[in-house]
Amino acid sequence: MHKVYLKPGKEESLKRFHPWIFSGAISRFDGEPEEGEVVEVYTSKKEFIAEGHFQIGSIAVRVLSFRQEPINHDFWKRKLEIAYDMRCAIGIAINPVNDTYRLVHGEGDNLPGLVIDIYAKTAVMQAHSAGMHVDRMVIAEALSEVMGDKIENIYYKSETTLPFKADLFPENGFLKGGSNDNIAQEYGLKFHVDWLKGQKTGFFVDQRENRSLLERYAKDRSVLNMFCCTGCFSFYAMRGGAKLVHSVDSSAKAIDLTNKNVELNFPGDPRHEAFAEDAFKYLDRMGDQYDLIILDPPAFAKHKDALRNALQGYRKLNAKAFEKIKPGGILFTFSCSQVVTKDNFRTAVFTAAAMSGRSVRILHQLTQPADHPVNIYHPEGEYLKGLVLYVE
């Protein structure tokens, strides 16, 4: 195993159990580790401090353990058992009306670079680091042992998620099984999961609790679901008793999937219509007929150099919603950009509210659900921000 030596003083963040080692903190390497290899990390005084996956780029090492231990099948199995036991403890993995949840959430489960989502009998595994890609087969074997007959398929979906500097060429495909049965259930509602071509692992698991909250506010309201993607906010609103629900997305494919999902749950229901159209153009044209609006756009910024434009985008989008929503309306507004902080997002929304001149009150401050835990030593893991606002 190759060794990495840090510059003097650069071990302090590791002493606080932060799971990332940046390339600028490294003094030298003992040898030439390969991309994705497990390396041992030492202080400038040659004291062991951690071990983890190495890769070329800004984050040079993602820590797997703060003690010396073999990173082998037993290691992965133990980590996956811990993750599964937590999901059972919070009730999400053993809920009879829900078979959709996140089993592994990267740094939140002390497995930086790895995401595993469960959809009924299929686990979708995604690598966000070179090391997790290199170790994918042993991880899949351990996952199969931990989950037993609870899963029949493991699909690997990492063609677009590895860092661009990684000299790797992952291919999507089944590591176990091969079933095309892609219907899963969330709190009694059914939906199609497109793990072959869909975004993320095929579905946005992280909005489950926020969708459930929306259901409580939907009765007798006219609902607009912007950036609808799979349409899940829409059919939660329908179950909640909305009098009409309109779903909007610029992607015709997203609209097709939304219509399929609505039909799966509410066949022939005339309350729902879907439109393939730009969000801003639709709000300008039709926005003043709604008293419940959901703004759940894709990430406006994935890197810090895009932050300024992202905040302008959030201000513009929310300002248009404040301008159009009916008096007494409720606005659910979100940001899933990790580089946009909670304060950044609130400031953008508050500025938009002030521009509208309307009285606005916060009803809820939202975040990601419990199966997307945040490692207390890695606050960067809190990426989903949301507000529920009452607009007079």
Regions found by a protein language model. Give the residues of each.
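Non-catalytic accessory regions of SAM-dependent methyltransferases
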Residues: M1-I118
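Non-catalytic substrate-recognition/targeting regions of SAM-dependent transferases
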Residues: V104-D117, H133-F204, S212
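Conserved class I S-adenosyl-L-methionine
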Residues: D220-C229
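Conserved SAM-binding loop of SAM-dependent methyltransferases across substrates and taxa
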Residues: T230-K243
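Conserved SAM-binding motif I beta-strand of class I
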Residues: L244-D249
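S-adenosyl-L-methionine
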Residues: K253-I294
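Mobile active-site "lid"/loop adjacent to the S-adenosyl-L-methionine
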Residues: Y290-K320
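C-terminal catalytic and target-recognition region of SAM-dependent MTase-like enzymes
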Residues: I330-E392
